[in-house]
């Protein structure tokens, strides 16, 4: 009986030890440090000098942009709002009064807006950030009880893709007078990044001493800052008073036809 008691005691301790080690192994979860060293500024200052004001109003529609999945919703909203703000500044700098339309659809113009607007500016496009497949590598953590880090890594270069199209409309008819498109893949923007995520397995004992770094969010913000500046620079070049006044005759004819 005594021997049997010792055996049961040993088996119980072994069971507890096994459960403790098992819990330790399952609980191993390496820490990931996400850097936050880049601010999403989205700044642009009109390059041309302010010209003489005109007694003309331009309707500015909200941008109809779509974004890649790796761009956070708050970044999308700021990009859209800053686009409206900076294009408004560019148009004001060219001597126009700007009426902001809280819609991206020209069909939402009120009759009063159609009547008083000399022109309307609409924007649509896709803002895409993607890893360059030629310069990006992925490394997945292998399962293991001891030396598995429990971290998957993707390291490479983030590049832009997509497009932005700006359309100049006559508000009363809704007809397009002109447009221009920017191919974002042609921009010389390259942001190095390291994206670190937890593996599907928990990692081994060594994972408790591992700290992973993830700067992919900073790379996204840096790329968006540069993309925004490039887009605004092109819009600033195109939406000059000289160019916009060249639509005077066509705009007047279209508005006149609808007013008859």
From Swiss-Prot:
It is found in: Cell outer membrane. Residues 134-139 are annotated as: N-acetyl-neuraminyl-alpha(2,3)-lactose binding motif. InterPro entries: NeuraminylLac-bd_hemagglutn, NeuraminylLac-bd_hemagglutn_sf. It is a lipid-anchor. Its main location: membrane. A lipid is attached at residue 28 (N-palmitoyl cysteine). It comes from the Bacteria. The keyword Lipoprotein applies. A lipid is attached at residue 28 (S-diacylglycerol cysteine). Keywords: Cell outer membrane, Lipoprotein, Membrane, Palmitate, Signal. GO terms for cellular component: cell outer membrane. Residues 1-27 form the signal peptide. This is Neuraminyllactose-binding hemagglutinin. It comes from Helicobacter pylori.
